[in-house]
Curated annotation (Swiss-Prot):
Species: Histophilus somni (strain 2336)
Protein name stated in the entry: Glucose-1-phosphate adenylyltransferase
Record-linked NCBIfam families: glgC, PRK00725.1, PRK00844.1
Enzyme Commission no: 2.7.7.27
Segment forming the signal sequence: none
Single GO BP term: glycogen biosynthetic process
Catalytic activity reported: alpha-D-glucose 1-phosphate + ATP + H(+) = ADP-alpha-D-glucose + diphosphate
Lineage: Bacteria, Pseudomonadati, Pseudomonadota, Gammaproteobacteria, Pasteurellales
Gene name as annotated: glgC
């Protein structure tokens, strides 16, 4: 039997023996009001997808069809999305996407206290019901394409008990990640979580090796280390801060370079992975998609990114004036109506209306937004269902924008939400729950 056939058979067996846990309970506080009413993984991305669709699509494309989604903060819109768009796996074949919500009590004692605790609190159902041999743990809030079966194969081949996905990042950004050092066999020799002075890769003084928040564990080893960790004083119940250091101390921790399993390389061979955890990074990652050859190819059918297909009418474009520049370098989703308006370098989600003589430039406009006549929107993120009145100007005078809206830390991006606009218009702002 050839090596390629043996490898494919090994991968097939590995994925069948693996349970995926997607940690999707995070708020994403650096996104401010954009995640006030939705968890970060449920945030819209790329015109008609959600952030969690990337992790889920990677699973399906990798042959991993036994998936648990661990939820906590503002989970309603996420749960609706999963029920409407991800309920196609045949459970009679042992395939599923199950929701694992935090079982909060009145005293808050059973909220997930950290990433490791989120797995620990579900350990009984994992061990007794799902019974996996391997557990793949993913963050539900990153944008990337990866073949997880290759990571599983590397995990088994190295005789690791725990394997962490890693990626090279600029050293000045590495303080936001767990940073590691490895030997020639990719065995992790040092690991520090979010260091102030990140260590560099040997012979690459400006680059560090960072954790992607992706882990493969032998299931029995994970049960054991979680049981030991829960009784440890002063623990933060976190994989990066508590579990990985234990695995490092026990010399069973290995690294898997993302370059070995990345499925999203651009034409220059560069790998693509983004943490869209700030307003600037969320805006930039969406705007990047409008270029002719974006780093992330959302049209690649060899590794499709699935989602919840909404039933909308086709978009309509009315141009009755000769001096109006048509839509230019933009993504326009279904059900949009553009009337004598200029749209350039922008992403419009479903059912956006832009009225006459308005200009939308370098902006990300979420679903069901209405933009009135003679408006100028530049470098904006417009949240869902916002109504922009006629003659509104945003993104031209940053100091005026600071008084009315949320301006990003770099001063480049302006976030506009429904409550901000109502307050500006003198309307009473009440707490509302939207079916997002």
């Amino acid at each position: 039997m050839s090596n390629s056939i043996t490898k494919n058979l090994s991968k097939h067996k590995l994925v069948k023996d693996t349970l995926v846990l997607i940690l999707a309970g995070g708020r994403g506080s650096r996104l401010h009001e954009l995640t006030d009413k939705r968890a970060k993984p449920a945030l819209y991305f790329g015109g008609n997808r959600r952030i969690i669709d990337f992790a889920l699509s990677n699973c399906i494309n990798s042959g991993l069809n036994r998936i648990g989604v661990v939820t906590q903060y503002a989970a309603h819109s996420l749960l609706r999305h999963l029920q409407k768009g991800w309920s196609f796996l045949p459970q009679e074949r042992g395939e599923f996407i199950d929701m694992l919500p935090a079982r909060q009590q009145i005293d808050d004692s059973t909220w997930y206290r950290g990433t490791a605790d989120a797995v620990y609190q579900n350990m009984a159902i994992i061990r007794d019901h799902y019974r996996p041999k391997y557990i793949l743990i993913l963050a539900g809030d990153h944008i990337y394409k990866q073949d997880y079966s290759q990571m599983l194969l590397d995990h088994v081949s190295s005789n690791a008990k725990c394997t962490v996905g890693c990626i090279e990042v600029p050293r000045e950004q590495a303080s936001e990640f767990g940073v590691m050092a490895v030997d020639e066999n990719l065995k992790v020799k040092a690991f520090v979580e979010k260091p102030k002075d990140p260590p560099a890769i040997p012979n690459k003084p400006d680059t560090s090796l960072a954790s992607m928040g992706i882990y493969v564990f032998d299931a029995d080893y994970l049960y054991d280390v979680l049981m030991r960790e829960v009784n440890t004083p002063y623990t933060s119940h976190d994989f990066g801060k508590d579990i990985l250091p234990k695995s490092l101390e026990e010399e069973v921790l290995y690294a898997h370079p993302f370059s070995r399993s990345c499925m999203g390389r651009n034409t220059d061979g560069e790998i693509y992975w983004r943490d869209v955890g700030t307003l600037d990074s969320f805006w930039q990652s969406n705007i990047d998609l409008v270029s002719e050859h974006p780093q992330l190819d959302i049209y690649d059918q060899r590794w499709p990114i699935r989602g919840n297909p909404t039933q909308t009418y086709p978009s309509k474009f009315f141009y009755n004036k000769q001096d109006i520049k048509p839509v230019d370098n933009s993504l326009i989703s279904g059900g949009c109506v553009i009337t004598d308006a200029e749209i350039s370098y922008s992403v419009l989600f479903d059912q956006v209306k832009v009225k006459a003589d308005s200009k939308v430039e370098y902006s990300v406009v979420l679903p069901q937004v209405t933009i009135g006549k003679n408006c100028i929107l530049r470098n904006c993120i417009i949240d869902r269902q916002v109504v922009i009145p006629d003659n509104t100007v945003i993104g031209v005078n940053i100091e005026e924008d600071r008084k009315r809206f949320r301006v990003s830390s770099t001063g480049k991006v302006i976030l506009v939400t429904e409550s901000m606009m109502k307050k500006l218009n003198g309307e009473k702002v009440v707490s509302e729950i939207h079916l997002d």
